[in-house]
Structure formats: structure tokens, C-alpha cells
Amino acid sequence: MESYRKLKENEGYDKSISEYVESNHSRQAATLNNYNISCDIYGGSGLEPAAQIHNEVTAEIIKRLHEQGTISKRSTLQFYDAKAGTFLNGRQVIGRCPIQGCKSEKAYADECDLGHQFEPEELIAPKSQLTGEVPELRPVDNLYFDLPAYLDFMKTYTAKLAQNPQVRSVVSKTMEEWLLPAQLYIQNKFREAFDAVEDQLPEHTVLEPEGNKSSFTVTFPSWKERDDAHAVLANGGVRFRSGKALVPFRITGNIDWGVPVPEVDGVSDVTCWCWPESLWAPISYTRTVLARDAKAAGVTEGVAAQDAALMGEPAADSTQVPAPTYQHSSLDWRDWWCSDDAQIYQFIGQDNIYFYCIAQTAMWEALGWNLTQSTVSACYHLLYMGKKASSSSQTPPPPADDLLNHYTCEQMRAHWLSLGLSEKPVSFSPKAYDTRVTGKDKDGNEVRACDDKRVIDPALKESALLTGVFNRLARSCFYGVAVKEGDESPYRNGCIPAGAASDTVVEAAQQAALAFEQAMYKFETHRALAVCDDYLRAANKRWSDASKAANKLEGEPANAAMTQALVDAFTELRVATVLMHGIVPAGCELICEYFDVDPVAFFSWDNIFASTDEFVESLGEKPGEHRVKPLPPRFDFFSKHESQY
């Protein structure tokens, strides 16, 4: 909303907010296509084909929560800009976070950019982004989910989560921080003022400061008593900061452009706040995909058919991520979300743990629909040139499409997956954008890192694996069996040679597949890529050693040795290509094309432990007779960007 407002006011943008969102969505879809990223649906909750289905899901969930007695009306305070004559939402207010110990650079109406939640009246030094004035606080009615009622459930759930090897410790530890008692932290210099009003406070206990601590702690039975204490302390001139604790989770707001909400408890003419509707948006997208399947199959009964009737068409000029060609095994969304064998995975940044691990978990429990709780993979922050990446900083990171002017999408995919954001914040520092001065030329002019040939590009760290090692192994296999005029070697028949791979090769392939799967099970993509790196380099060396040894022989021993080297190399190439497929799909699918095998069969993990002979037999062919596609001279499966030559 805020970026749209600024565009209209400062640049004369004359289109509707729906058109603005649609244009942004189209650009993002084009970027996903440029990076070879596909999905069942890339949607927007306010855009067709999902918009009307999402409205229906929103109404169903809010009505259900009300039936369960877990949402109700609360009158709370909201910022109001008297000069602009309007209520302020979200990022239209900026100030400092009131949460104890928070180091956020920016805080907004009721949350900071590190994900901390608080009441608007707690925001320190609020300022309207519309006029620069200090806004007023005026009462408004909204619906709130009773999140504190699920404190005991959340404690038990979080303790179990801490034992789950798939869930990173940053998730459970961050969740634990929100499950503490409702507390206020008051600096010692306000102790006299606090003592003067303490008898007016609701029930509480005081924890005296230990050692050299500069503040003491006041603990309340619940958030209600803590909130009641705010006015007493403020009137007494006592400044304070809040500790993290569960508080009612706001469901609605008064923003004009949003998901409509049915009237509940007399609250009407409101829309759903963006965060809660983002929690159930994946359910809406699931239902949209299944509605699309139902429509294509001519299904006329069931929820999917009803959703199909709601489903609209995307804007004619919008860019779309291509839909998959397969049909899903069940059209009932509950089979995907509520069945005993359902698995839900969500990939988020660490600053969104509160929403997707605290609020969502409690809400799913409250609905009573047997919704599967998500397995959340939370990453640390991606830095840019060593600093927090932000579009509003002095050095904002380049848009993803701009990077393709300097790097291939395969190089970027491999590099980003290698960064290890599952363990710590890591800097993305592409040399092409590095403007640091690293020296002077012979004429005394300053040389920037981006132009300095001595500076190694961190973003190309993984590129050598692709353009060097992986290319070399693939070319060696296909050129090794290519028909060659004047060469009567039995393995030069254009087919993958039959025979069992050596024990060393079989063992290495099995260990690589298992290690890769274990890393991916824990969402440790950097470790998965490291497994592939080690495996490819070892496979390339085995091929190099074996082919050189074979070339030193003559006659039948030479033919037998080279055939065995090729059997081993093709085994390793097929396994490596399957492992690397999700990392660098375009190059791997090109290798599959020259194997001349259906991609569904080639990339199926059902065949990962099969020998080459067994794999060929599964295609309905005899070992030694599967013909590969002839490889042109000097062919690259993985290429450098044209600017890198």
C-alpha cells in the first residue's frame, strides 16, 4: 500500500492498486521463469485464479474460529494522522521497537522489521510517513484470535519441535522466546517513580536487578494485566519496555484493499490483515490447483468443483509460471492438508517465525480440522556486500533479473544454494557489483573491485564445478562412445556399454545418494551441493586415471579397460545428474536429452540405486544397445556467461 501511495503521489501513477499488484506479480513470474523455477501455482491472494477461492477460504476459517470461541471483538488503539485525516496502517508509521533487547533499525505500527509484535501505543517515537507528524491514537474495533489461550499447547509443541532433526534450532529457540511470562523491563533510574505508583498496578511481582544490570523486571499473570499497567506507569512518568509474550493476534484491519471478512460480533466493513490471511493462503492455492484439475477433468461434484465455479481468469496480459501437465491424485484438499500421511513444508526467513510457527500453529490447533502442522525451514538473513540486504538501503541489492546481465541462472542457483543460510547470515557479494576501491592502475587512477582482475568473484565459486568438472565428465562419456571414422574399438558404437560398474564406483554412488538425501532431509542445501562437488570431482579423477591407463594398453586389454572406464563413468554421470537436477536443472536436462531417455524415468529416484544395465532394461532395451544422442564437437552442457569470456 505504501509503495503504491508513493508511486501515485510522487510519479503520477494512474492505475488501480489491483493493476499495480498484477504488474509486480507478472515481473516476479517472469523472474521465476528466467531462473528455471517452476511450481504447481504461482499465485496472489488478491489475483485470479485464486482470489475468489481465497475469499471463500478466509470466510470459512474466520467463521470456524468464531464457532470455536477463539476470535472476538477487541477495541484497541490505532494511529491516526489528523493532518492527513486518515487512519494509518502498517508501514505508514515508523518508530523504534519497544521490545526489550531489540536492535531493529525500523519499527512500524505494530511490528518491527525483525518480526517483533507489540501494541501500537508501545511504539517509541512514532511518526507518520504521510505527513511527518506525530500521529494520534484513536480506538477502533477489530477481530482478534485468542493466541494466549494456547500457551500450554505451544510449550508442549515447541518442546517436541526441538527434538525434530528437520527443524533448525533457530526455530524452536525463537518460539521459546515468545512463550515467556508477560513482563515489563524498567530502568533503575525510574525506580522511585515506579515505587510511587506500584500500589495502583494489577497483580504483579518484581524481580530485582542482578549484578550490574541497569533494569528490573515486573512480571504479570497475563498480557491483560500487563496492558492495564501501561497507563498507570505512563501517568507516573515511568518508561518501560515489553518482553516477548503471547498476545491476542489481530485478524482484521481497516485497509480498503484487502480480503473481505464476514461480520462477526458486530465488527463489519473490515478486511483481513495481511499476516493472518497469508497463513491460510497456501490452503487457498492448494484448492485453486485442485479446482483447475477438476475443471480440466469435467468434475461436477465436491469442493474442487465448487471452487472451480469461483475460479476466475488471470489478466490477459499477465505473465504466468507454466502450470504442470500432470493431474493430482486427489481433488480433495483435505487429503493434502488433513490426512495422517500429509506433509507440509514451509520455507521462510527467520524474521517470520512468529507468524508461521507461533500464530499459525495455535490457529491450526484452534480450528479443530486436524490440519497438519508445518515443518518449517527457516533461514538466516542474506546480507549484501556484508550488510543487511534492504531495498531502502544506500546500496540495495540488484534485482534478480539484473544479475543475469553478468551471470547465468545456473551459476546463481548453485551459488545461492551453497551459502549455508541454514546456519548463519551470509553475504552475497557478486564482484560485478562490488564498487570498493582495491588499488590504482599504472596511471594512478582508482580501480574498483568489479574491474580488478586480481579480485576473485565469490559468486563464481561454484561455477568451475559446472563449466569444468561436470562438463568434462559428461563430454567424456558421450565422446567416448561416439562412432569415429577409422576407429573400430567395440565401445565406439554410439551406445552405453553393458557391464557392471566397479565396486568402488558402486559404493561411491550409493554413499553420495544417501549423503545427498540426508542433507536434503535437513534442508541443508549447502551440504547437499558439497556432496555433489566431492562426488563429481572424484568421479572425474577416476575417469581420468582409468582412461589414461587404458590408453597405455593395446589390443583387447585396451578395449576391455576403456569399456570398463566408460561403464563406470556413465554410472557416475547418471547419478550425478540426478543429484544435481534440482540445483542446475537446465544443464542436467540437457545431459538427459543426450542420454536419449524420458526425463520422468531418468530423474526418478526409484532408479537411483539401479545399475546402468538394470536402468536400460527398465526402458525395455537390452544392456549395451541403448543408443545415446550424438554430441556435437566442443559442446558445453554448462556455459559461462558471455561477459566472463
Q: Could you describe each region identified by the protein language model?
A:
Residues 18, 269, 273, 400, ...:
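Amphipathic, non-membrane alpha-helical segments in soluble helical-bundle scaffolds
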Residues 37, 71, 163-164, 285, ...:
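Intrinsically disordered or highly flexible coil/loop and linker segments, enriched in small
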Residues 56, 127-483, 530:
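Structured secondary-structure scaffolds
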Residues 1-201:
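N-terminal, positively charged nucleic-acid-binding surface of large information/translation enzymes
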Residues 80-83, 378-383, 421, 431-438, ...:
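A glycine-rich phosphate-binding loop feature that marks nucleotide/adenosyl-phosphate handling sites
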Residues 19-30, 60, 465, 469-472, ...:
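A non-catalytic, amphipathic alpha-helix used as a structural packing/dimerization or gating element
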Residues 74-79, 83, 92-115, 121, ...:
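Basic, alpha-helical terminal appendages of large translation-related enzymes
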Residues 432, 452-453, 462-467, 473-528:
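Long, amphipathic alpha-helical stalk/connector segments used for oligomerization, subunit docking
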